[in-house]
A protein has these predicted regions:
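PLP-dependent enzyme catalytic core of the Aspartate aminotransferase-like
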Residues: 30, 175-180, 185, 189-220
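Short acidic/glycine-enriched loop/turn segments that link adjacent beta-strands
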Residues: 82, 157, 191-194
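Active-site phosphate-binding strand-loop segment of PLP-dependent enzymes
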Residues: 1-52
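Short beta-strand-to-loop capping motifs
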Residues: 90, 163-167, 200-202
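Nucleotide-activated donor-binding/catalytic signature segment of Leloir-type glycosyltransferases, i.e.
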Residues: 60-68
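PLP-dependent aminotransferase class I/II
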Residues: 67-147, 151-154
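Conserved PLP-binding catalytic core of the aspartate aminotransferase-like
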Residues: 135-136, 147-180, 196
Length: 220
């Protein structure tokens, strides 16, 4: 959706995933600021699940806008998918409201073990930065290889890439990769039904993925 569509105002609320899923595309801070300015009368929630892989966080805008909530998960760049831990940033008027309803939204509250693990992950800055940098490097290397194979690869600021090939249907590639034990995401939706979303793994995993794709492309 074009950013201009989110700047019309008159909404009951605005939710923005930045970076977006499944494309991986990021919105720059000046565009997020425009969205906030255009929707002063409602809450703007920015979901930054993938922000640490190459996008700019809106967290620094929280002191300026009392209608902004920024949510982060520790499941991605902090490597804690199993603990289901996250947090929200906002001014007191919004965080107080979240505290009132949090147990109504999720009956399984964050337990002591998850809180301890989450706090430790937030303190370990060196591991976090090294992991995020490694994912980005592997992502760009994989994207370059896929472009050599003829794929369109959207610029990504997430831990996945969104790809399409002019001569191979995405659904056919999905099936071929599945037969080789390689799982990717395909979306049966208008406008994106000829694209695959490929999560970034280790260098070895991405080499295996590229080799499997190349083999499929050589088949008539």
């Amino acid at each position: 959706m074009p950013v201009a569509e989110l700047c019309r105002g008159g909404s009951g609320g605005v939710v923005v995933a930045n970076p977006n899923a499944p494309t991986g595309r990021a919105i720059e801070l000046h565009a997020l600021r425009a969205i906030l300015e255009s929707n002063r009368d409602c809450v703007v929630l920015v979901d930054e699940a993938y922000v640490d892989f190459g996008a700019q966080s809106a967290a620094g805008l929280v002191p300026e806008y009392d209608n902004l909530v920024v949510v982060h998960t520790l499941s991605k760049s902090r490597s804690l998918a199993g603990l289901r831990v996250g947090y929200a940033l906002g001014q007191p008027n919004l965080t107080a409201a979240l505290r009132c309803v949090r147990d109504s939204i999720n009956s399984y509250t964050v337990d002591r073990l998850a809180q301890t693990g989450g706090a430790a992950a937030m303190r370990d800055r060196a591991y976090f930065e090294a992991t995020a940098a490694k994912v980005q490097a592997t992502r760009e290397r994989t994207a370059a290889r896929l472009r050599e194979l003829g794929f369109t690869v959207y610029p990504s600021a997430a831990n996945f890439i969104f790809i399409s090939h002019p001569d191979r249907a995405a659904r056919a590639l999905l099936a071929g990769l599945r037969e080789k034990g390689v799982l990717v995401r395909w979306f049966d939706r208008p406008r994106i039904d000829n694209y695959l979303r490929v999560s970034i793994g280790t260098d070895e995993e991405m080499d295996a993925f590229c080799a499997a794709v190349q083999e499929l492309l050589t088949k008539t």
